[in-house]
């Protein structure tokens, strides 16, 4: 069987007492048109006339709940969706084209661009507005999903605002370089790392046979076109060009997106944005040292859901 190559760029890739309340909201499958087949998601309906949040997952094989096929199961987006329902806010969380429930939307889940992901977001917005009658839709993105949210919002009047969770402020080539440089065992191959990323940033492909075996999966030929496209986008510039309400959440102990290197760039790009820094939260927005729930999920910081809900309700 032909092996699947998943994009994996981020290398280090609490809601308490909500379950009983979340049951009051109706959860059902929902689809949107994709290029070759449907895009799939889950609609949590908190009631007629409620605000709706569209949730875009992060990089690689990350599903609509925020769980990774590579083993990490924080369920960040599912927890947020269930939590928002208790505040009377509906949501749609989605699988990306070519993956999970949206596998049939395209022939190859690695043959994608940020612009195509953004196009899918706009397709979802049309479906959700038609289904709910909402005038506009909030778009929430986690990690790379925040970049997709920013790209989708350019010139779109039917987006209420953006909610950016653990979102890079630097181009992702710079983020990946920093992540790899932070790995102690990578010290001897740093020149190869820098050469490969420099080439991709310049729009050039990399011969993986010239790389250390441990780097060949990161720069696999099947993901290089996506990486070339991805590295071309500057989140801070996209945010600067967007003029709607923006809510930014960043974990202080996030090892993938930096509270010191990324967050200041986003704040500078939009001084009017509402920013919440959670000092002890990791990339998934769980507290550092959080004890996994029985389903393996990591309870997110208790401030995340009420802060998002308050921001939406104020706008």
Task: Spell out what each predicted region is.
Residues 48, 53-84:
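Short, surface-exposed "cap/lid" segments of acyl-processing enzymes
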């Amino acid at each position: 069987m032909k092996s699947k190559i998943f994009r994996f760029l981020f290398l280090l890739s609490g809601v308490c007492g909500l379950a009983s309340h979340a049951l009051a909201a109706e959860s059902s499958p929902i689809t949107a048109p994709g290029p070759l087949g449907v895009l799939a998601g889950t609609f949590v309906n908190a009631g007629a006339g409620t605000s709706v949040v569209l949730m875009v997952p992060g990089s690689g094989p990350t599903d609509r709940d925020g769980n990774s096929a590579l083993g990490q199961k924080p369920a960040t987006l599912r927890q947020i969706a269930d939590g928002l329902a208790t505040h009377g806010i509906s949501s749609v969380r989605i699988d990306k084209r070519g993956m999970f429930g949206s596998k049939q939307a395209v022939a190859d889940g690695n043959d994608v661009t940020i612009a195509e992901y953004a196009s899918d977001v706009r397709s979802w917005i049309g479906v959700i507005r038609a289904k709910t009658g909402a005038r506009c839709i909030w778009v929430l993105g986690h990690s790379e999903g925040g970049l997709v949210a920013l790209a989708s919002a350019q010139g779109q009047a039917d987006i209420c605002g953006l909610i950016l969770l653990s979102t890079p402020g630097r181009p992702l080539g710079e983020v990946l370089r920093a992540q790899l440089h932070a790995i102690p065992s990578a010290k001897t191959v740093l020149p190869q790392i820098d050469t490969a990323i420099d080439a991709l940033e310049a729009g050039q492909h990399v011969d993986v046979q010239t790389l250390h075996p441990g780097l060949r999966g990161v720069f696999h030929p099947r993901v290089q076109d996506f990486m070339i496209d991805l590295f071309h986008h500057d989140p801070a510039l996209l945010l600067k060009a967007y003029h709607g309400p923006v809510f930014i959440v960043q974990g202080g102990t996030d090892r993938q997106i930096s509270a010191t290197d990324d967050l200041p760039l986003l704040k500078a790009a939009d001084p009017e944005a509402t920013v919440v820094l959670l000092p002890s939260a990791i990339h998934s927005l769980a507290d550092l040292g959080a004890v996994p729930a029985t389903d393996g999920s990591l309870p997110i910081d208790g401030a995340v859901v009420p802060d998002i809900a308050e921001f939406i309700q104020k706008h």
